[in-house]
Amino acid sequence: MGSFGMDWNQKSSVLWDWENMPPIGNSANENPKNVMLAESKLAGVGVDIGHESGHSSGGTFSSSSEIGYGSSKSSISASIDSPSKVGNTIELNFASAEEHDKNMDKGKSKVDDTGTSRSPVVAANRVEPLIGLKLGKRTYFEDVCGGQNVKSSPSGVSVATPSPGLAKKVKVAQQNTQNPHCQVEGCNVDLSSAKPYHRKHRVCEPHSKTLKVIVAGLERRFCQQCSRFHGLAEFDQKKRSCRRRLHDHNARRRKPQPEAISLSSSRLSTLLYGDARQQASFLFGQAPYGQMGSCASSWDNPVPGGFKFTATKAPWSRPTIAAGVDGTHVSNQQASGNVLPHGAHHSFDGLMAFKETNAKVLNQGMEASAVASGSARGPDFEHALSLLSIDSVGAANLQPGSQIHPGVTAIAGTSNPVMMPSPAIWQGGLSLDQQAQFQAFDRLGNDDDEDHLQLPKPSYDNSHYDQMN
C-alpha cells in the first residue's frame, strides 16, 4: 500500500496545475495555492492510507480491487461546503456504491415529470419524501430551496388558476343562491317559487305572455322561442314567437305544397270538348267551327230531283236529322258534323215531311244513331253520319218489312254513293250492322208517285233516346 501512496503523490503533480487553474475564491487576485486546501481521504474496509498531502487535492480516480474493497465499482461525489474559512474546500470522498446510492436517493428530487429538465437537489438531513400536486402534465412541489420551483405560492403550494368555464359556473351558482326577481320594470315579483323556466330567464309568467312590457326603458316583448326580449317590430300581432323563429320553425316542419293547377271554365271546356269537335271536323273534311261548306254528291247531275248535300258544323244542341228530295228546303238544328240534305223535314220524334205526302217514319233508333247521344258519345255520332259504300252487302242489310214504292228503285247498284273517310276513332266503335247507313233513292220517270226514303232499322232499342226528350 505504500507503493500506491507514492504513485499517487507523483501523479498528483502532473494532473493538477495550480498555476493554470481559474480563481475560485471571492477575489480574483487570491492565490489558489493559499486558498484551496485539498484533503484526500480514502475510505476502505479497515484500511487507512494515512497519507495526506497538500498537492493531492483532487483528480480522476477510480478504485478497484487493489484498494482492498471487495466491490469493483465505486464513484466520486463532490460536495461544496461554505465554512467560515476564507476559502472553499474541495473534499473528495471515495465511498462504496451502496452508500453512494443511499445518499443520492435522499438528495435528489424531480422538478418536472416531462423529463425536459432534471436538476438534482441535495438535501442533507431530509429523509421524508416530497409530496407533489399533479395538475395536468405538471407536478407542483413544496418550496424547499427557497423559490426555485416553477410555480409557487406564498403558502408554499402553487394554486392553479380557475378556468373560465369554472368561473362561469361559480357565477351562475352565486346568482341561483340569490332570490331571482322579474326584470320587467315595475314588477318585483319573487320568482323563488316560480317554474324553473321563469327563474332562469328572470321573467314572471304573466309578463312572458304580455304583448308589450318595459325592460331597461325600452318597449319589449318576450319571445318564447328565443327566451329573450325582442323589439315589438319583430313580432306579428298575436304570435308569441318572433317572426324569424316562426319562419325557421315552419320551414323545418312543413312540407312544400305542390303547385295548384287552376283551370278556368273556358279552358276546362276546351280540354274536354275540343278534341271531339276537332275529330268531327276532320271526319267530314270541313272548315273550322262555325263555317259552312258544301259538297256535291258523286252522282251530281242536272236533274232537278237530284240530291245536294251541305255539311255544317254547329254548337252541340238537340239533335235532329233531315232528308229531302227535289230540293225541298229543310231548316234543322243539328249536332257537330251532321249532313243536311236539302229536302223534307224529319224531326227527332220521327216525323218526316215530303213534297207530295207526309209520311210518318217511326224509326227513332236510326235517328239517334245518326246523332250524338251526349258529350260522352260524341265520336259515335260520326259513326251514324258516315255514308258507307252501298254494295250487295249494303243492299242485303235492308229490312224485309220495309215499304218501298214500286216506282222507286234503289240506286245502290247503279250509282256511286258519297264516300266519307273513316277516322281512326272508329276502331273501338260499333260494328257494321250497328253503324248508320244512308241509302238514297231517286225517282224513275216523271210520275207523281210517292217517294220513300228507306232507312235501315238499328239492332238496339230506343229506350235510351226516349229519355233524352
From Swiss-Prot:
InterPro entries listed in its UniProt record: SBP-like (IPR044817), SBP_dom (IPR004333), SBP_sf (IPR036893)
Sites where the protein binds Zn(2+) 2: 223, 226, 230, 242
Zinc finger (SBP-type): 179-256
Gene3D superfamilies reported in the protein's UniProt record: Transcription factor, SBP-box domain
GO cellular component: nucleus
Domain notes for this protein: The SBP-type zinc finger is required for the binding to DNA.
Localization of this protein: Nucleus
Biological function: Trans-acting factor that binds specifically to the consensus nucleotide sequence 5'-TNCGTACAA-3'. May be involved in panicle development.
Motif residue range(s): Bipartite nuclear localization signal: 239-255
Composition bias type Basic and acidic residues, residue spans: 97-115
Annotated residues for binding of Zn(2+) 1: 182, 187, 204, 207
Regions of compositional bias (Polar residues) in chain numbering: 460-469
Reported tissue expression: Ubiquitous.
PROSITE patterns: ZF_SBP
Pfam families in the record: SBP
GO MF term set: DNA binding; zinc ion binding
Keywords: DNA-binding, Metal-binding, Nucleus, Transcription, Transcription regulation, Zinc, Zinc-finger
Residue ranges, annotated region (Disordered): 96-118, 446-469
Name this polypeptide is given: Squamosa promoter-binding-like protein 3
Gene: SPL3
